[in-house]
Amino acid sequence: MATQPTGSLRYGFFLNPKARILFDTWIGVRPDDILLSPSGGMEDEFVAHLKKYLFFRTKASIASLTGAFRSLTLVGREAPAYATPLFSSDPAEDGLRILAGGGFAFLHPHQFAFEREAGPWIDLWIPRETFEKTLQDLERRVLSAGGTILSPEAMETYRLECGIPLSPFELNEGHFPAEAGLDAVAVSYNKGCYVGQEPVTRLKFQGQLSRKLTGLRSKSPKIQETACPRPLYSALDGSEAGTLTSLADSPAAGGVIGLGYVKRAHWEPGTALIDGTGQSYEVSDFPFVSPD
């Protein structure tokens, strides 16, 4: 990140020595520090991991800002219009925006994922003392314009509709970055030595994937069982085909959709799979729904 300009926002992985995913994080560059925002509610584990390496950089320090802020997320085509009035006017800002009233925003470039456009996705980090007023103002503006306030369950459905992997469901120590389709944006192949560099580079230039993240459409009208992960099998011969990682009922997509890691022999769109409960699926491309 030393070469990135102030105001830039990047996405990256922290890997284990075998190049499996430990954490994924958004990285924002400010004039005097760097913001790190791990996904999946894993802040404590992430901070502990970073502190293990502090002795290599004695001039660095780590501090948690979580207690000073509360967050909310804007998604959809109109999200930038709702967020822009909150920004400062610094022209140097890019994906990281400073809020005029304190706090900051991450403008996620989710279109990088799988080279598909996932639509605007903006995380706002607002000082706790002004959060309730800011939230009320935003909700009023969104509702008056015909927008919707999404519950946590609805946000999860939206994530799956866009085909966005999330820690710890799709992004965890069981998978390589390339299996999630994110190695091109979250891993450097020309940076100096880092944990996991050798095996992740070897996979890139010498190996081939044995499984990858795919979309899944259920042939059942309703979710019979929501617990994940669960194994997937070929509907033809019962052979092991992969793992279902996330599942949701999406009226916009026309039924039950999910994400999962599927083996090479079964990952072609249209391939029929079943899980251990007898629920049937069909491998599908994503996003399931065109972004608004």
Model-derived features with residue positions:
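Short, surface-exposed ligand-recognition loops at beta-strand->loop->(often short) alpha-helix junctions
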Residues: 1-2, 74-79, 217-225
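Intrinsically disordered, low-complexity, positively charged segments
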Residues: 1-9
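Glycine-rich, small/acidic residue-mixed loop/short-helix segments
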Residues: 7-8, 17, 21, 25, ...
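A glycine-rich, hydrophobic loop/mini-helix early in the fold
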Residues: 12, 17, 170
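Acidic, low-complexity central loop/insert segments
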Residues: 26-165
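Short, charged, solvent-exposed linker or helix-capping segments at domain edges/interfaces
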Residues: 83-87, 135-136, 171, 226, ...
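Anionic-ligand-binding alpha/beta catalytic cores of soluble enzymes and soluble regulatory domains
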Residues: 125-217
